[in-house]
Regions:
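Hydrophobic alpha-helical signal peptides and transmembrane signal-/tail-anchor segments
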Residues: 1-18
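Positively charged N-terminal leader segments that act as targeting/secretion signals
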Residues: 24-37
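Generic enzyme active-site microenvironment
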Residues: 328, 362, 387
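A glycine-rich (often HGG/GG-containing) alpha/beta subdomain
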Residues: 12, 42-203, 207, 211, ...
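Switch I (G2) and immediately adjacent beta-strands of P-loop GTPase domains
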Residues: 114-118, 310-337
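Intrinsic-disorder-associated, low-complexity terminal segments enriched in Asp/Asn/His/Tyr and depleted
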Residues: 13-21, 26, 43-44
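C-terminal-of-GTPase-core extension/linker across diverse P-loop GTPases
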Residues: 55, 60-72, 199-320, 337, ...
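Inter-motif core of Ras-like GTPase G domains
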Residues: 344-365
């Protein structure tokens, strides 16, 4: 590896002096590129300011790129985003006021027209951002044009025909990463924000974008590096401790383990806020499932009728359960029927409950508990929130009798019993809380200040936690200090994978290929 690195640097120096194209140099040195004058080193290469494996051969640093950054749908405005070396100069060639654009300071806006030869394409406002004070760390421009898809594409086509290349997925954010404008936790948070379904999901991703996870990882790394430094001093200048366990203070390592454990435990809860949960509404016919479905959605999606068997197929929709994204299913009522279509719907209901994270089982409080209810609940495979519906039409004595009857059945899968009125909207807060309590049981701190944002991050934190734990075991067993040092160095490298200071090229490709074009 050192030979390859040395050879790559020689190639870079040789071809750079010849003003050789970086893309061609990429091919010659086997995909390894040294990026000139970058302040952040994703691979922690100390012999140059920045060295990165490009995750996609089409990702060429500094090459002028452009992409539509807004949805291709009728709108008041559309934006075409551009970045790269010379992008302002290139844009000036198709701009009606080239001198004003070339002289524009960073964080300024210039009015004019995009032109194709002598033809005016659209009246635009151009936002100018100068390196390094831009999202990518390069010179950037954003062309704000009228938002019709035809107009936006026409503006982009003019740019593509005048020196710009179509940006790849995530290429703008990738350039921000290699130019030190964002670590990997922030880059991944950008995509999380785009994909967030609720305000709480967005808030958690914004926290990572603001740097709370990076700061937590940096704090843990400092604990490890401080301990590592003290051990290395002991190796160089040994004293007379009887055992290795006595030769250094392990309090920082124990604190690192505590904080790594909290981070590791946070992922299951954070994953729920990203991916959402599957919640299935079921119960006997006319229990009020469709009414509850419509009430939660705040729209009439499901047909509501007093006629039994109205719902024969299932409906689904994403909803906000107190900040948690939930994929909610309304299903056919459970009953024995000779109607072939309805019977198929009942079978689909049972299949959906097998894949659910939580079952919301509705029972009409005025009708009470039936043998069919009990039989279904005893066979349930997933946790159940049992909902007595129509409490607005159920007197207190009957409600108490119903609750006692349910408790006497002692059904294992029922985790919560609540009372609601789908018609009046009563008990919805308790309903959301019950579902969340079940889902977050055993997931660590639901309100973690710095939670993990991806499975990749969790894997790296798990490895770091294992290495730190092993270092303490090694010290307790009186292994050589070099063994402890190796464990701590491994842990620091694993944490570097979280932030991107140590990351393989295939990992980068996996991360940035998930982004939309223009981000």
């Amino acid at each position: 590896m050192r030979f390859l690195l040395f050879f790559s640097i020689l190639c870079y120096d040789f071809f750079y002096r010849l003003d050789f194209n970086l893309a061609e140099m990429n091919k010659i040195v086997g995909g390894f590129a040294i990026c000139k004058e970058l302040g952040f080193c994703p691979y922690n290469l100390k012999i140059c300011k920045s060295g990165v494996f490009m995750p996609d051969p089409k990702y060429v640093p500094e090459e002028p790129i452009c992409a539509v950054a807004t949805a291709l749908a009728p709108a008041a405005l559309g934006i075409v985003r551009c970045t790269g070396k010379g992008c302002v100069s290139l844009l000036s060639k198709v701009f009606s006021r080239p001198a004003a654009l070339l002289q524009a300071a960073g964080n300024s806006i210039v009015y004019g027209w995009i032109k194709n030869g002598g033809a005016k394409i659209d009246e635009v406002m151009v936002s100018v951002f100068r390196a390094p004070k831009s999202f990518t760390g390069e010179d950037m421009v954003e062309v704000s044009c009228h938002g019709g898809p035809g107009v936006v594409m026409a503006v982009q086509n003019v740019l593509l025909n005048n020196g710009f290349r179509q940006a790849e997925r995530g290429e703008f954010t990738f350039r921000a990463f290699i130019n030190g404008k964002a670590d990997l936790t922030k880059a991944e948070a950008v995509q999380e924000i785009i994909e967030s379904r609720t305000g709480e999901s967005r808030s958690r991703a914004v926290g990572r974008l603001a740097g709370n996870l990076f700061e937590e990882i940096s704090g843990i790394k400092k604990l490890l590096t401080d301990t590592l430094a003290s051990i290395e001093v002991e190796i160089e200048y040994p004293e007379d401790e009887e055992t290795i366990a006595d030769s250094f203070d392990r309090s920082d390592l124990q604190e690192a383990i505590r904080r790594l454990s909290e981070l590791n435990d946070s992922w299951q809860g954070e994953k729920l806020y990203q991916d959402g949960a599957r919640v299935v509404l079921c119960g006997r016919t006319n229990a009020g499932k469709s009414s509850l479905f419509n009430a939660i959605l705040k729209e009439d999606r499901a047909i509501v009728s007093d006629i039994e068997g109205t719902t024969r197929d299932w409906l689904e929709s994403w909803v906000d359960f107190g900040g948690l994204p939930v994929r909610l299913f309304d299903t056919a009522g459970l009953r024995e029927t000779e109607d072939v279509i309805e019977a198929h719907g009942v079978e689909l209901t049972k299949n959906l409950t097998e894949d659910a994270d939580v079952i919301l089982y509705l029972c009409d409080g005025a009708s009470g508990l039936s043998k069919d209810d009990v039989d279904f609940l005893r066979n349930a495979e997933k946790p159940v929130v049992f909902c007595w519906n129509k409490i607005d039409a159920t007197d207190a004595a009957l409600a108490e009798k119903n609750s006692l009857a349910l408790k006497n059945e002692n059904i294992e899968k029922i985790k919560k019993e609540i009372k609601i009125s789908a018609k009046k909207g009563n008990g919805f807060s308790e309903l959301y809380g019950a579902v969340k309590e079940i889902l977050f049981s055993g997931t660590g701190n639901e309100r973690a200040q710095a939670g993990l944002g991806s499975a990749r991050q969790k894997l790296a934190v798990e490895e770091a936690l294992e290495s730190v734990s092993h270092s303490i075991v090694a010290a307790d067993k009186d292994f050589a200090l070099d063994a402890v040092v190796q464990d701590l160095e491994d842990a620091i490298d694993f944490l570097g994978e979280v932030t991107g200071e140590v990351t393989a090229d295939d990992v980068l490709e996996s991360i940035f290929s998930r982004f939309c074009v223009g981000k």
